[in-house]
Structure formats: C-alpha cells, structure tokens
C-alpha cells in the first residue's frame, strides 16, 4: 500500500515530534514475527511509554535528519521496527526481553545521547535499574540523615520517660 505525499509528510512530522521528546531510539529486524507476537510486543511497549512503529526507511531517514538521532541513518536497511522513548532503560529492557523470547526479533542498534549504540550496549543498558528504582534509592538516601536525626531527637524524651518509670518502680518497691 503506497502512501500519498500528504500522508508521508504527516508520518515524518509525527515521527519528528516523537523524536524531540525521545532520549533514545532502537531499530530491530522483525522479519518472521507473527502478527500476534507483534501485537503483544506493541502492547507491552505502550504500557512502558515506548513508541513502536514500522515505518519506511526513507521516511524515517527524513524524520531523523537534523536531529541527534541522524547518526543511525546507515542502520536503516531492510524491514525494521523503530522505537523511541523518553526512558532509555525501559526501551532497552523491552527490546532485550523480547529479543530473548522471540528469536526473530534481532536488535540492530540505536542511539543514546546522540551516540550510536550497538546491540551489546543496549543489552548492558537493559541491566541498569529503572528510573523509578533510581528515584526510590535517591529518596531513601536523602531521607536517611533526616530520619536518623528524628530518632536521635526522639531518644531524649524516651530516655527521660524510662528513667522516670524506673524511679517510680523503685519507690513503689
């Protein structure tokens, strides 16, 4: 099915707006995947706020032009699935997990912070903690000194109450 010029321009414009918000992109070969497998993959991607799209390479090259993701132009050969996301770790985990389960999904490469990365780098990125986990660790680290200070302040009245209870018990005996 060929697209009309206006439809092609709209696809390129949509991709460019998604790329402005994206921190990372990945392309993978999907030849041999069933429709059901691809549907499950897309649903999983949507849950993790990852935009996944099968798009013509020429349209994708036009969308990538003038962006930090243009370094991946030479990777765009053959039928590919393109993905972009604000969270690079979620993107990497999605592709790595599905590539393990679906041998037909082959990660070609991607871009992170304006630098091209290969499948091995994407696999390494997938092993990092997610954004939520990192924020939880940061919050715990920030709260630890305050919590310790509160416990120290609470210890003074507690010690005083225990001393009074000991004096009361001693007088009662």
From Swiss-Prot:
UniProt GO cellular component terms: large ribosomal subunit
Gene3D superfamilies in UniProt: 3.30.70.1730, 6.10.250.290
GO MF annotation list: large ribosomal subunit rRNA binding; structural constituent of ribosome
Pfam families, alphabetized: Ribosomal_L10
Domain of life: Bacteria
Function recorded in the entry: Forms part of the ribosomal stalk, playing a central role in the interaction of the ribosome with GTP-bound translation factors.
Descriptive protein name: Large ribosomal subunit protein uL10
Protein species of origin: Acidithiobacillus ferrooxidans (strain ATCC 23270 / DSM 14882 / CIP 104768 / NCIMB 8455) (Ferrobacillus ferrooxidans (strain ATCC 23270))
Encoding gene, per UniProt annotation: rplJ
């Amino acid at each position: 099915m060929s697209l009309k010029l206006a439809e092609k321009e709209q696809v390129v414009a949509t991709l460019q707006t998604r790329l402005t918000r994206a921190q990372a992109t990945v392309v993978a070969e999907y030849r041999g995947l069933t429709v059901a497998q691809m549907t499950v993959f897309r649903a999983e991607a949507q849950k993790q706020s990852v935009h996944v799209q099968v798009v013509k390479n020429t349209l994708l090259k036009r969308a990538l032009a003038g962006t930090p993701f243009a370094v991946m132009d030479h990777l765009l050969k053959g039928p590919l699935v393109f993905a972009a996301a604000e969270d690079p770790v979620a993107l990497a985990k999605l592709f790595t997990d599905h590539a393990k389960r679906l041998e037909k999904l082959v990660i070609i490469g991607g871009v992170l912070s304006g630098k091209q990365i290969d499948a091995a780098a994407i696999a390494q990125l997938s092993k990092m903690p997610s954004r939520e986990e990192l924020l939880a660790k940061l919050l715990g680290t920030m709260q630890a000194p305050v919590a310790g200070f509160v416990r120290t302040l609470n210890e003074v009245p507690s010690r005083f109450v225990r001393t009074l209870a000991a004096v009361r018990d001693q007088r009662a005996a």
